[in-house]
């Protein structure tokens, strides 16, 4: 298990456009393995390569069934609907905002061996696909919210969500 340091907001690599992966080799496999280990250790639901200082189009997403999906050279090919909800980021610790994303997202990507595939999901996983792919283009979720929640506002938002679900 190899954990990588998570890059924080303000560091240059989070604002750069990542280059596509062209070599599907052992270095890529090590990166993906390390990213999965780092994601699981962090308690997050997604991690993009620039968040560990690597400017390549690679990300990992943990879906709502706790499966980790590896996405190499991902692109969003279809969206449907809209959802608005709370979002945070491992590279922006302690900060949360309300962000609107598509409800359903289909992604075309390659696996660690270069094989193309498509994956479609909704809700939190769809939100995560969008969030992580934006990292590959040098963007952070804070660009989509005009207000970062204070700790008090965050707790109030969570309380209201729980009441709505009850």
How should these model regions be labeled?
Residues 1-130, 135-166:
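Active-site rim/adjacent substrate-binding subdomains
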